[in-house]
Amino acid sequence: MKTVAIIAASGVGKRMKLDGGMSKQMIEIGGHTVIWHTMKAFQDAESVDAVYIATKSDSIEPFKQLARENGFTKIHSIIEGGKERQDSIRNCMDLIEEEIESSGVMPDAILVHDGARPFIQPEEIDEIARISAEHGACVPATKPKDTIKYIGRTPEVFGETLDRSRLLQVQTPQGFTPAKLIEAHRKAASDGVYATDDAALVERYFPEQEIHVYEMGYHNIKITTPEDVPVGEAILAGLKARKSEN
């Protein structure tokens, strides 16, 4: 099975309140940077053949050095991201399309992951890739723990309460067969359409495509705010403890 992964890692961490536009991927958790954890997970995933990373221009060389020094041989390209996350992914897909044309080999699946989700596990990546290749699309998600309500007629009041049993919190990596993901992004670029995730684009342009759910644990958080760092430390410690028990 051949899988190609895209990692979107251009976030500057405004909500992290980092100085000088520092990338949140360079925050350390458990003695390693966030992006190190993410790179390692994809390096260790048996299904993944090549990884394309989009990041800030001043993070390209540090990321390349990190990959070299740690033997992350699956990191194929590290390029400058675009203005929006979707633009960054499109930049990576342009390179993937070129590779497909030159090699004549079509991947079984393309995965798109947030660089700031460092606790994804290699075996989870492999399973999402497998389901994506078999069914066309797969997205990891968790059941919400809290009750969710609509905002009412003004931001100061609530509207109706949503049925929590029918809700899922969506995460990454999101996986798709290459043809549909590439075409969805191509059409979105032509139409000037932006979405918050890749699944939304596939839903829009291929409504007949069912997107399969991979139910994820609560460890696969996105490092977004300062409070996420100590939570991440605890998650990492828990993951290490479980692995040592096995």
UniProtKB/Swiss-Prot annotation:
EC number(s) from the headed UniProt entry: 2.7.7.60
A Pfam family assignment: IspD
Keywords assigned by UniProt, alphabetized: Isoprene biosynthesis, Nucleotidyltransferase, Transferase
Gene Ontology terms, MF aspect: 2-C-methyl-D-erythritol 4-phosphate cytidylyltransferase activity
Gene3D superfamilies on file: Spore Coat Polysaccharide Biosynthesis Protein SpsA, Chain A
Enzyme class: transferase
Catalytic activity: 2-C-methyl-D-erythritol 4-phosphate + CTP + H(+) = 4-CDP-2-C-methyl-D-erythritol + diphosphate
Pathway(s): Isoprenoid biosynthesis; isopentenyl diphosphate biosynthesis via DXP pathway; isopentenyl diphosphate from 1-deoxy-D-xylulose 5-phosphate: step 2/6
Similarity comment: family membership: Belongs to the IspD/TarI cytidylyltransferase family. IspD subfamily.
Protein name: 2-C-methyl-D-erythritol 4-phosphate cytidylyltransferase
Organism from which the protein derives: Chlorobaculum parvum (strain DSM 263 / NCIMB 8327) (Chlorobium vibrioforme subsp. thiosulfatophilum)
